[in-house]
Amino acid sequence: MRIPLFILTFLFTFFSLATTPVSADSGVLYTDAVTYCAEAKAVIVDEFDITYHRSNGSVTFSFSLASVEPNLNTSVNLYINAYGIQIINQTLELCDLLQGVICPLPQVNFTGYGTYPIPAEYLSKIPSIAYTVPNIEAYARVQLIRVENNEVAACLQATLANGKTAHQKGVIWASAIFTLVAFLVAIWHTASGTSTSPIQYRWFDILFIFQVAAASGLLHLNYPLVYTNFVQNFHWALGLFYSSSMQSSISKMREKTGGSMDSTAYSEVQYINRKLSPYNVYMDDNGILSSPESLAAFFKESALSKRSLEHFAKRATIPSVLAQNMTTDINTGLPVYTNTLRIPEANAYDTIWFVFLALIGIFIAFHVLLFGMVLLFDRMGRNRSHLGWAARLRRMWWPFCVGNSLRLCLIGFFPIWIFAFWQFHIGDSGLSIFWAVFGILLTLVPLATAFLLSLLRARRISSTSPEINSLYTSFRYFHSIGVLYRQYRQKFHYFWFTPFVLAMIARAGFIAFGPASAWAQVIGNLVVEFIVLVALLACRPHKDKKGDWLGAFLSICRLIAIGLLIAFIPDMNVKPIPRAVIAFVIIVFYGVPVVFLFVGFLWNIGYGYLWCKHSTRVEDGLEVERFSPTSSNSSVPPPMMKNVDAATFVSSDGAAASRGSLSMGGAGASGAGLAGGAAAAGTGLGRRSSLIEPVGDNVYEASASSADGALSPPPVTAYNPYGKEEIGYPYDPQDSRLAYEQAAMGRGGVNGPGSPTDEKQWSRRY
């Protein structure tokens, strides 16, 4: 189906205005970067700049060149292309221009500059969209051709810009600071020990959306220029930071360990001639200027006179520049992405690896300083309730450090796996390959270990709350590995690893190992994201509906953004303007989730402190607070928790039996019952016995509901929520409370004297 051109133009203009700030420099077109497009042989060009000012319809230009051959007569071919549309492609004789001053070319270095008005007939041909769209895909090429044999004597190419770009320092800093603050706030809430704020796991959603956006620019696709500039805003999320000294050290390291790949990074303008380039040519031969005569007339009107060339002066010889069209054969995607950041593709993984090592050093230093502060405030605040957080954090310090270490692995996981796989793909330095293997192990082993330990722990039955997953009752697990699974329901505690971590591995593999097939890269990532979305919709793993909705929404946005990348596959042959429109749509699908996450971040900052202060879910640590002495501000364990000597321990069943014997058989029977209970305790503890027993006044108050409890059901074979078979009475919270009250009041057990089967006797005793 063909989309009407006016609709594409409207969408193109709308999204460009929505993503580009208004500036005082609007209405200016200029050469952004200039380079040789062929080896300089007969003519050396040192400077070539052109700027068009829309406000006064004039052009200012400057150039510096020299001929190295005598009697060099050339013609000039001027070619201008914008969004694949050929605007100018004309060849003119230099002897017919500028009154023959440069025919033949002077064999001296000379410079020229000036400002000249452009006739109105040409101004009307320039579309207004050229001044509003960021990163316009336009370039000019100037070739000097020998008159005698039509060989190219010199070739220059220059990208054109209007001062608007999707690559903004403000976006880079804002996104990086947003992620950093979210991470620090997450650590702050975790350090409190009692916070239930979702920011403790939402921080990774913020980081991951930026990592996915940056990684989408690493594929072997024909990207629009605006999209390549957009994804470069998030190079920090992949750990790609440029440092000249670090790049020099990495290059030397690679050379000494078998590396042979080029260590030079090339600028973006040098990729103009590539097959997969935003400047490639597609369309139509209808130019703004229709004939050589009309173009010659323009030069004649604004020609330089001999008098105006008096300022040309001899200069020192300009050294020859090597041919730079060697970048023509470089693959698009990851190599171009890193080279644009001045990082050679061969140095890409080592750059990320050393940045990650620096992050580990910062992590260690941060925790050392924090521990010193905790010790200081703990000593200062033993009698001050507002400093109770220090005492809590000191007791949970090692689980806290383990949890933050797992977070650090998540930060580096996706970029390290992408570029480690890429290092395997290109080979080169043996030491770089070793670092790649080490990086994979350093990020995978801790997360895989945490995953296996959580699976084993989840199969254990808690003695205090057998109906609840042990991961959500264990203090050590909840405050360490819990930073990964606490956002999920007990049944889906593993969801952080399967499918999310495994999905990151699959994405990295398709990106790094698929540069030979753009279809494999895009479809592979699309299938992975689709599987994640289906898992989210089918399982609804989050502990609340808000989490399920947000998780599915983020996945849908990623799925649409990845799916739209199909338009950039070279085989699709999508024309430049539709590709640019699609690029703006993809930018929207990455921008909208960031807005939602930012609003949620503002809400979650005070969550657990200013509002929603109390835990209401097991997944929020409700059971951990009930059975942990660190759940309060006091450094003294509450009275209901008491360590009991196993040698003299009397279980609840034994105590209840003894009290029942006392009530039914008098003092003599009481002694026998007590002895029987002690003997039972000495023989061994029951399956549900615990060395932590409620003592003192911390017992349930008798209630009418418990007094009027129904008869206990017959024993059945049941399975607990974690797959273990149990024979006996199925657990029910109301029945447990009733049994507890019965034991506290001296009742004799389920079927013994004083049981619910003897209602009259129970009524008299109650």
Curated annotation (Swiss-Prot):
Cytoplasmic face of the membrane: 192-205, 373-407, 454-493, 539-548, 602-766
Topological region Lumenal: 25-170, 227-351, 429-432, 515-517, 570-580
GO annotation terms (biological process): fungal-type cell wall biogenesis; transmembrane transport
UniProt keyword list: Endoplasmic reticulum, Glycoprotein, Membrane, Signal, Translocase, Transmembrane, Transmembrane helix, Transport, Virulence
E.C. no: 7.-.-.-
Phenotype seen when the gene is deleted: Results in cytosolic calcium elevation and increased nuclear content of calcineurin-dependent transcription factor crz1. Affects cell wall integrity and leads to abnormal distribution of chitin. Sensitizes the cells to the combination of osmotic and temperature shock, affects vacuolar fusion, and interruption of autophagy. Finally, results also in a significant loss of virulence in both the invertebrate and mammalian infection models.
Sequence similarity: Belongs to the transient receptor potential (TRP) ion channel family.
Name of the molecule in the record: TRP-like ion channel protein flc1
UniProt organism field: Cryptococcus neoformans var. grubii serotype A (strain H99 / ATCC 208821 / CBS 10515 / FGSC 9487)
Gene for this chain: flc1
